[in-house]
Amino acid sequence: MLTVIAYLGLLASVLIGTIVIYLGLVKVKLI
């Protein structure tokens, strides 16, 4: 059970990181 929670947490952090990087690139392109 703990492994599932850890996996979901890792997946969520990776997804959030990807979104942050994507938004950063969009802001750079807009400027």
From Swiss-Prot:
Main location: plastid
GO molecular function, one term: electron transporter, transferring electrons within cytochrome b6/f complex of photosystem II activity
Location in the cell: Plastid, Chloroplast thylakoid membrane
Bilayer disposition of the protein: Single-pass membrane protein
Stretches that traverse the bilayer: 4-24
Keyword set, alphabetical order: Chloroplast, Electron transport, Membrane, Photosynthesis, Plastid, Thylakoid, Transmembrane, Transmembrane helix, Transport
InterPro entries referenced in this protein's UniProt entry, alphabetically: Cyt_b6/f_cplx_su6
GO BP, sorted A to Z: photosynthesis
Assigned GO CC terms: chloroplast thylakoid membrane; cytochrome b6f complex
Protein family according to the UniProt entry: Belongs to the PetL family.
Role summary: Component of the cytochrome b6-f complex, which mediates electron transfer between photosystem II (PSII) and photosystem I (PSI), cyclic electron flow around PSI, and state transitions. PetL is important for photoautotrophic growth as well as for electron transfer efficiency and stability of the cytochrome b6-f complex.
Quaternary data: The 4 large subunits of the cytochrome b6-f complex are cytochrome b6, subunit IV (17 kDa polypeptide, PetD), cytochrome f and the Rieske protein, while the 4 small subunits are PetG, PetL, PetM and PetN. The complex functions as a dimer.
Name of the protein in question: Cytochrome b6-f complex subunit 6
Source organism per UniProt: Oltmannsiellopsis viridis
Taxonomic path: Eukaryota, Viridiplantae, Chlorophyta, Ulvophyceae, Oltmannsiellopsidales
